[in-house]
Amino acid sequence: MTELTFFPTDWRSEDVEPDKGEPYFRINIFGKTMDGKTVCVRAKFTPFFLLETPESWSAARTNLFITETAMKYDAIRPSCLPTKRKNMWGYDGGKMRPMVQFVFKTLSQMRKAKYRLKNEYQIYESSVDPIIRIFHLRNINPADWMHVSKAFPVETRISNSDIEVETSFQHLGPSDLKEVPPLIIASWDIETYSKDRKFPLAENPADYCIQIATTFQKYGEPEPYRRVVVCYKQTASVEGVEIISCAEEADVMNTWMTILQDEITDVSIGYNLWQYDLRYIHGRSMMCVDDITGEDNVRLKNLGRLLVGGGEVIERDLSSNAFGQNKFFLLDMPGVMQIDLLQWFRKNRNLESYSLNNVSKLYLGDQKNDLPAMQIFEKFEGGADDRAIIAAYARKDTDLPLKLLKKMAILEDITEMANAVKVPVDYINFRGQQVRAFSCLVGKARQMNYAIPDDKMWTVDGKYEGATVLDAKKGAYFTSIAALDFASLYPSIIRAHNMSPETLVMDKRFENLPGIEYYEIETGLGTFKYPQKNDETGEGQGVVPALLDDLAKFRKQAKKHMAEAKKNDDEFREALYDAQQRSYKIVMNSVYGFLGASRGFIPCVPIAASVTATGRKMIEHTAKRVTELLPGSEVIYGDTDSVMIRMKLPDDKIHDMDEQFKMAKWLAGEITKDFKAPNDLEFEKIYYPYILYSKKRYAAIKFEDPDEKGKVDVKGLALVRRDFSPITREILKESLDTILFKKDTPTAVTETVECIRKVLDNEYPMEKFTMSKTLKTGYKNECQPHLHVSNKIFERTGFPVPSGARVPFVYIEDKKNLDTKQSFRAEDPTFAQENDLIVDRLFYIEHQLMKPICSLFEPLLDDPETEIFGHPLIKGKIDELKSTFKADLRDAKRTKKNIANNQREITSFFKKK
């Protein structure tokens, strides 16, 4: 027997059926010790659920039921015990209910029993993942140091780890160790070849995987310690890089896997691994088969820490409104944490392009070496020096992800989110918000002696209103506007009014209990009541409010630690605590959505309706109190959690920014007194000037300090929307800067007219007109510009655009397709420039510039379209374009009709001189 402290990198679970003995359930935990030894801990666990029994049953009747049920469904009888828990569904005064905890040897046995018993009895918590269960039972963080108090040697090993032990889940616990874990990060990238000069396809015999580059860096260290490129065919040396040349393609992949094992890799990262590199390696491994024996020459099973089972194919589907349906293709690496930085950026950043080159340029000021695919193919066919150029290119593609990982604190972001919600890291990559919130709820419910019932759902009859938006008083305000915001409004409402599934009154017997104060709120779904907690003792607090209290406390602590780390110039810990506090904030804000979902683990739509109804009342009350506390003031707009106020101040204080800040803070403090804690109305900024277009659409200069210069703040306008071209955003930005900073509308009009004139005269480069959209799968409407362009790219190059990629396109003048839909006139910008194609100026004027520009100037001009687009400098040019378009369209239709009728045009009889 021994003790063990290690940092976990991967959690796995499985039912085990040994050759001898009973089947059992096991959790395999992989990780690394402080001295760099790899670990595999095999922890036995007995899955369980709770079952509610009738209150009328005697102890003898209950015991008989336990015995009979345990025998019938293969439960572990000595471990199946009666207990009492509170039901987390519907207020009943916190009554303890009789339950039985049924414990099973395997997860499959537990599930079979649950499905057979659920129609007769109320089952609780059968859907809790056993790994998540252990996190809460043993107070373990999924990605933090942990301790095994009793570990035993194994008879038969399942891993190649330095240390492999068996234990019971009861011997697992957290560790006090706070050191940076000695994790080895491997950033890797493959280079591929196509003999036919098309997009390389793994199933084509001659489309080899020609190089695999890997850069290794120890977590927390400033620089990599090893760079290696494994190459197919002899390759010359590259400075600072270890070159390994192989005679066979299979040797390239096998050597690479051996290097990963030798370096004891804990974290595997790259860019677009899950949609390209891993799929390609798997495809090529299937091609590398011994001609005589038929055996695989590539040993994918060597991936990861298990002796058997590495390299298995894992396909994941991820569906979202933003990206459509995406398929991810992984090769299993047991014990190794896998991160695809491309997917992290798609999920967390809103960018024009997600290419490694663009992302690196944006966040690092660095970029890839320029080596197009065709040159890679040519250099592979050349000599050793040519292939060395490919190796240098590949090495750079492994350095950039490591720099991005550190710069953006991506590993910290993922692991701290996993720790905050107590789910495996893998869930952060591939699961949504529901399972995160549910895990938090499971832990808090257990602490408070509640059980979460299975299959509970509120039948929605009617529709509740969303967040309040007070009528926007549109206009250009060249006076100061104070913005008052509620801090974390929805979580604060839930905490203040004790809203939780088990505090919601669903039974009239409990709606007027003596000595209990209730909060009552009317919604579109009906009127709901919630018993309030005792403010002095905390008695009666609901599970969800208690959970949110904890998360708020944890976030406050993390922000404090972050400030201390910043003070001590500890960048690593500052990033760590920043990731922590952001994780807690995200979880707090996701609880409302979790409860308001129509389907899920414990959907409770009345709570969501109650929260939004309460928020509406608070916004309306705030607007009323502003005019009472500061007569003559006006609320010009109210959104979900904020109000915009034109404060009435003495004439000599109107332009005094210090006085504006002082009065706004006083207003916020006075109104906060009207609301139940922890609701807090804060003052954070003054807008001056402020142009209000409609709800959720404004432009202003924001001041967060009376002595600062101020920053432009825009919401809802074309200026900040990706579906408009850069030229649109550029013109709008220039116009808006003049309006806001110079407060000079006439000059802004003049500058805008000149910009439009330059568009009409083709004075802007093509990239200013280039837009992009994410390519999805399964379009119902195939008349999409980016879809047409992606098809054109494939037809011309043989290189398919992968699903999930952003496809750039530009609309060009195309007389042949004037009578077709506009999307057919979309073109690949690179092709358009190489072939001297002209931008469709009329399209950009009418569909990209006219409406956004007129909308921008609407509060400032009587007739923006006439004053700008009717200006003598540009009106004639626009009219000429329209006239030419009509004539060309008429000719195109006539030509198409003649072709359809097999008729020659009269001009075909004339000879050109």
Swiss-Prot record:
Enzyme class of the recorded protein, top EC level: transferase
Superkingdom as given in the UniProt entry: Viruses
Entry keyword set: DNA replication, DNA-binding, DNA-directed DNA polymerase, Early protein, Exonuclease, Hydrolase, Multifunctional enzyme, Nuclease, Nucleotidyltransferase, Transferase, Viral DNA replication
GO biological process: base-excision repair, gap-filling; DNA replication proofreading; nucleotide-excision repair, DNA gap filling; viral DNA genome replication
Disulphide bridges, residue numbers: none
Region feature (Contains conserved residues essential for 3' -> 5' exonuclease activities): 182-401
Keyword field contains Nuclease: yes
EC number: 2.7.7.7
A GO term for molecular function: 3'-5'-DNA exonuclease activity
Catalytic activity: DNA(n) + a 2'-deoxyribonucleoside 5'-triphosphate = DNA(n+1) + diphosphate
Function: In addition to polymerase activity, this DNA polymerase potentially exhibits 3' to 5' exonuclease activity.
Family: Belongs to the DNA polymerase type-B family.
Name under which the protein is recorded: DNA polymerase
Gene source species: Paramecium bursaria Chlorella virus NY2A (PBCV-NY2A)
Gene (UniProt): DPO
